[in-house]
């Protein structure tokens, strides 16, 4: 990976080093070196808006180039708002946009422009971007070898049998176009990245939730709160990728717009057809020396226009049938990764449901503890009421007036016994009433 970083990073120009050395060594009027450690050429490039891009062609070859924003807009025929989606300084939701000459992909760390001939990425040291570049190179080189092998086999079979060649001369190799292969690798990288994050979250979440159910503490609750925040953010990102793929699958026009190789081939074919038509008309033009028959020329022109209209209608019908097949091909590709991202979303949904179940279980435990505290408080209140009865009796007998009851020696004992029995009866009556009303467990 370090070798790839060194290969993809643009080398520092010698002029920049000279300017930097000169700025360091040249003394100023005050005796201090001006612009100490400042890359003057780098500041100039930033002022011009030059950015480093990684270019991957159809053969898997990489190239680092520095292009400004307006040149990139003209090169890919993109508006400025689409290029802002690729800026790593801004946070945008996952988006896949099909334009006239390019596909703008913004899937997590993978932000690139896919054309019919190349893939353009902002030069970055992010490991996921470098892995995407490496995987794209390997896939493109493997597919190019497979196409060469298939072409050699087709040539060999064509030499062996002419009938076999006549039967299968119109068959095309079962390979995806370049833009679909690049898009597939971007989808695979994004889905793999999100699925790995979901798996890491699962590994961390389930033991923590099990520990929380057995021991409720402030530390565990704080850890679960942070875990749930991460889960909500990750679920939102996965949901956005899933919605973007589903939106593409539901719109046939957007899928047809993403078939860049076919559009390029049609454009080249139409230009070639126009040139051949102009050449045909110039070759069939009337010479000056030959006599012109006013009767035979209009039917020839009508016959020519009729043949051209028939050829155009056949071309349009063939184009529509090929477009339907290509849309179906792209739809199958998107459907495969829709299943993958939907599985990741189901995994996160199951984890969220497990967290909700744990929260419900904890709430039930807390409700049970709160009910026990309420029952205990009810018993204390009842006991306080019974003790208050003793206080009332003591207050009555503590008044300063003459009672004959004070002169009897065993009267105080009977007062205590009768008061205690009455208090016990009152307390038992309250407890029975609470159990009868199911305010306390039986």
Curated annotation (Swiss-Prot):
Gene Ontology cellular component list: membrane; plant-type vacuole
Transmembrane parts of this sequence: 378-398, 414-434
Molecular function GO terms recorded: magnesium ion transmembrane transporter activity
Swiss-Prot/TrEMBL keywords: Ion transport, Magnesium, Membrane, Transmembrane, Transmembrane helix, Transport
A Pfam match: MRS2-like
Main location: membrane
Membrane topology summary: Multi-pass membrane protein
Tissues where this protein is expressed: Expressed in the whole plant except stems.
Localisation per UniProt entry: Membrane
Region (Disordered): 1-30
Function: Magnesium transporter that may mediate the influx of magnesium.
Family note: Belongs to the CorA metal ion transporter (MIT) (TC 1.A.35.5) family.
More info: Has the ability to complement a mutant in yeast lacking magnesium transport capability.
PANTHER family cross-referenced by the UniProt entry: MAGNESIUM TRANSPORTER MRS2-1, RNA SPLICING PROTEIN MRS2, MITOCHONDRIAL
Name of the protein in question: Magnesium transporter MRS2-1
Originating species: Arabidopsis thaliana
Gene: MRS2-1
């Amino acid at each position: 990976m370090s070798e790839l970083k060194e290969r993809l990073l643009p080398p520092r120009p010698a002029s920049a080093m000279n300017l930097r050395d000169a700025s360091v060594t040249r003394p100023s009027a005050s005796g201090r070196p001006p612009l100490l450690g400042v890359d003057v050429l780098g500041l100039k490039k930033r002022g011009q808006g030059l950015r480093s891009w990684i270019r991957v062609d159809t053969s898997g070859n990489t190239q680092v180039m520095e292009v400004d924003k307006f040149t990139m807009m003209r090169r890919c025929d993109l508006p400025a708002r689409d290029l802002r989606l690729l800026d790593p300084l801004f946070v945008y939701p996952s988006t896949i946009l099909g334009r006239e000459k390019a596909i703008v992909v913004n899937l997590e760390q993978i932000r690139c422009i896919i054309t019919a001939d190349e893939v353009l990425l902002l030069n970055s040291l992010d490991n996921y971007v470098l892995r995407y570049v490496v995987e794209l190179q390997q896939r493109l080189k493997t597919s190019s070898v497979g196409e060469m092998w298939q072409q050699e086999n087709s040539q060999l079979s064509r030499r062996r049998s002419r009938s076999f060649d006549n039967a299968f001369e119109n068959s095309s190799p079962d390979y995806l176009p370049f833009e679909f292969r690049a898009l597939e690798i971007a989808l695979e990288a994004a889905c793999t990245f999100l699925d790995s994050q979901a798996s890491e979250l699962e590994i961390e979440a389930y033991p923590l939730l099990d520990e929380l159910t057995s021991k409720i503490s402030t530390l565990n609750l704080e850890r679960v709160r942070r875990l749930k925040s991460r889960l909500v953010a990750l679920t939102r990102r996965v949901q956005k990728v899933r919605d973007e793929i589903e939106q593409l699958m539901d719109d046939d026009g957007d899928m047809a717009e993403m078939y860049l190789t076919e559009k390029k081939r049609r454009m080249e074919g139409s230009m070639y057809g126009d040139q051949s038509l102009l050449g045909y008309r110039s070759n069939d033009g009337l010479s000056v020396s030959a006599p012109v028959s006013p009767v035979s020329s209009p039917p020839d022109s009508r016959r020519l226009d009729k043949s051209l209209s028939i050829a155009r209608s056949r071309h349009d019908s063939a184009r529509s049938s090929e477009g339907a097949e290509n849309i179906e091909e792209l739809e199958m590709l998107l459907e495969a990764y829709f299943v993958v991202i939907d599985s990741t979303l189901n995994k996160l949904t199951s984890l969220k449901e497990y967290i909700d179940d744990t929260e419900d279980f904890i709430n039930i435990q807390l409700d049970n503890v709160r009910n026990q505290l309420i029952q205990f408080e009810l018993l204390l209140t009842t006991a306080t009421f019974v003790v208050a009865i003793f206080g009332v009796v003591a207050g009555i007998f503590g008044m300063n007036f003459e009672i004959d009851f004070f002169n009897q020696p065993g009267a105080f004992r009977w007062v205590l016994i009768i008061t205690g029995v009455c208090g016990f009866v009152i307390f038992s009556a309250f407890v029975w009433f609470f159990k009868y009303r199911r305010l306390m467990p039986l």
